[in-house]
Amino acid sequence: SIFYGKLKEIYSNTVFLDGDTLREVFGNDLGYSDTDRRKCAMRYSRLCDLLQKQGIHVVCCTISMFDSVRQWNRENIANYHEIYVEVSDETLQKRDQKGLYSRYQSGDETELAGFQVGIETPKNPDLVLWNDGEKTPEEQAEIMMQTWKINN
């Protein structure tokens, strides 16, 4: 969201889409099975494509689990940039921002991406950021700005 804020300062026609928020916007009508996750991902991709075609800059943050969806994005969304934010399982579990990992460890979470549910990690992202806490979110956002030569 910090990158979005920096981008919005330059391009007022910028929107931020978050996967969890989008699930709510679409009525939480899909579950967490592989089929539902794929449907959900394609909804987000088509929405990003629609907005981009209307001249809107889109920053969309999702778990992005599927190669086929990322390929669709590359083939259909103009100026698509894929950023892969890597983080260790240990760091994810330590942060546990949504309580998912503690629910997983207690057996209450049964479809946790990256644990019970496989993730197809990106093969050729445009940028890889390591989110281990060594760099601040502001520094990570600046790396993104520099990568695409966006001047603020």
Model region roles, listed by residue range:
Residues 94-152:
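Small-molecule kinase domains that catalyze NTP-dependent phosphoryl transfer to phosphate-bearing small molecules
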Residues 21-23, 64-67, 86-91, 134-135:
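Conserved nucleotide-binding/hydrolysis micro-motifs of P-loop NTPases
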Residues 25, 33-81, 101-104, 111-114:
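Glycine-rich phosphate-binding loop used to anchor ATP phosphates in small-molecule kinases
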Residues 59-61, 76-95, 129:
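Conserved phosphate-donor/acceptor-positioning beta-strand/loop module used by diverse small-molecule
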Residues 1-46:
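Conserved substrate/cofactor phosphate-moiety recognition/catalytic segment
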Residues 10, 76-78, 124:
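Short, structured coil segments at secondary-structure junctions
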Residues 13-15, 56, 81, 125:
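The start of beta-strands in P-loop NTPase/AAA+ ATPase cores
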